[in-house]
Structure formats: structure tokens, C-alpha cells
Amino acid sequence: MKCFAQIVVLLLVIAFSHGAVITGACDKDVQCGSGTCCAASAWSRNIRFCIPLGNSGEDCHPASHKVPYDGKRLSSLCPCKSGLTCSKSGEKFKCS
């Protein structure tokens, strides 16, 4: 029941979010299409989705830069798109 509630909350957040694009469930990057990675859910690391790589100005995780990554990602953020780097910007890390 707890998992069901988490999924419902996730779907509601996505429905009202302008930036979230989810392309499918996954376990590893190789299951996702080009330009995406298999990122952990922000609510449960046991749930992963294929999401787009970061564009300029979007949040990123500095230690998450290899695509495809062989293991299971622990971050809910994908690396930046090719040609961009994940750099500290104020209190957060952003693709630039």
C-alpha cells in the first residue's frame, strides 16, 4: 500500500510539473534510449525511470557523469548532455 501511495504521488507531481519527462521504467541505463539515463526516483531509490540528460541550466549531480553507467544509479538526476559540464552554481550544481 505504501508503494502504491508513492506511485500515486509521483504521478500527480509529474502531471503538474512542466519539466518532468518520463519515458519508461528501467533498472540500468542500457534499457533507456539515446539521450536519457535510468535515474532513481526522488521518493524511492528502488524505482527508476528513463529521463532526459540535463540541458543547460538544469540541476545535475556532480558524481553522475558516465552514460551508460554499468550499475544502478542512486541519483534522481541524469548527467548533463554531451558538451555540458556539471558545475556548482550557488548552492546547487547545474549543467553549463
UniProtKB/Swiss-Prot annotation:
Q: List the disulfide bonds.
A: 26-38, 32-50, 37-78, 60-86, 80-95
Instruction: Indicate whether Ribonucleoprotein appears among the record's keywords.
Output: no
Q: Which residues form a coiled coil?
A: none
**Keywords linked to the UniProt accession:** Disulfide bond, G-protein coupled receptor impairing toxin, Secreted, Signal, Toxin
Tell me the GO molecular function terms. toxin activity
May be important for binding to prokineticin receptor 2: where is this region? 20-24
Q: Which InterPro entries match?
A: Prokineticin, Prokineticin_domain
Its primary localisation, in coarse terms, equals: secreted
GO annotation, cellular component aspect: extracellular region
- Where expressed (tissue)? Expressed by the skin glands.
The Gene Ontology biological process annotation of the record reads: endothelial cell proliferation
Record has Ligase as a keyword: no
Cellular location(s): Secreted
The signal peptide annotation in the UniProt record is: 1-19
Q: What does this protein do?
A: Potent agonist for both PKR1/PROKR1 and PKR2/PROKR2, and inducer of a potent and long-lasting hyperalgesia. Shows an EC(50) of 0.264 nM, when tested on neuroblastoma cells (SH-SY5Y) which endogenously express mainly PKR2/PROKR2. Also potentiates capsaicin-induced TRPV1 current, when tested on DRG neurons. Induces a biphasic hyperalgesia to tactile and thermal stimuli after systemic injection of this protein into rat.
What family is it from?
Answer: Belongs to the AVIT (prokineticin) family.
Give the protein's recorded name.
Answer: Prokineticin Bv8
**Which organism's genome codes for this protein?**
Bombina variegata (Yellow-bellied toad)
